[in-house]
């Protein structure tokens, strides 16, 4: 864990997919940097464990939101709730994602296809729709969305995931293009190979210890979330 530099002191941040992997690592780092966190994930127990870890490390007590991102009405209510409590939002990290089946496109059941699109793409649209007004009330609103090299569509059997990430990239670039005269910046971050549960599911024969841990890429998230970040509409690759 990097030592605190205070770059995010007092910043209010929403992180989705916060209970494990990259989301949990980013949450702990943001807390170490002084941010007040609103953590969203489906798994209550994992959120509570993260809460314990953040407070043990001296971070502010986060707000825990157990929520399935496919409950779009709940995402609408999130914006209203945050507006009432904080009156603004400084940082949005759209990290949550699911892999879906690695199988030929013609074999994918429609409901499975829809689930991957809902979580990886549509939920982020709904988050923007709900939270953009609050980001615009910040002195330096920052939105970061996690994508993947799979968005190129060059990998066989990755259809739903690839399409959902390609859609996410188009969404974020369109959103960023609308932000030119505002104080909000929106960017994409592609983590590359990282030691996560999703990576293990996608590449079961790979040695996890050969991959960098999620903590190794957290500096990039801090850079993109900080008030002094001037990047907008970019796809930033972790190297």
Where are these regions (language model features)?
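The beta1-alpha1 cofactor-binding region of Rossmann-like NAD(H)/NADP(H)-dependent oxidoreductases
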Residues: 45, 66-77, 110
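C-terminal helical subdomain
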Residues: 181, 188-189, 196, 205-239
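Conserved glycine-rich Rossmann-like NAD(P)H-binding loop of the short-chain dehydrogenase/reductase
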Residues: 33-50
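Conserved glycine-rich cofactor-binding loop
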Residues: 12, 19-20
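Catalytic loop of short-chain dehydrogenase/reductase
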Residues: 98, 110, 136, 141-181, ...
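Active-site loop of short-chain dehydrogenase/reductase
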Residues: 11, 59-60, 88-89, 135-149, ...
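Substrate-binding pocket helix/loop in short-chain dehydrogenase/reductase
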Residues: 103-105, 109-114
